[in-house]
């Protein structure tokens, strides 16, 4: 149950804030831990996109920039649905993470399902 609209729930304080960020401001840290964008996956996400069930991309705000930890295919699917133009994206934004913590969270939540870049 939401008490107010500052992202606080009864007894729960999530480690992120929901924020709308323009996709042109989102960085995919491929040289560090992200995998490349797979066009077929983006097209599948765009084809089946449902805003009621989509997971918000997870983003780390570090050094004044927004780094995508998870959800790059969702972001690219939204852009594809927007005719290829950048657009606002609802994101879960985490603060206070190091690059290493971002990489660890990415790897743990994705279960090492595919090879990570040489940055790890």
Residue locations for each model-derived region?
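Amphipathic, charge-rich alpha-helical segments that serve as recognition/docking helices
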Residues: 90-120
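Short alpha-helix boundary/capping and kink motifs at helix termini
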Residues: 1-69, 73-98
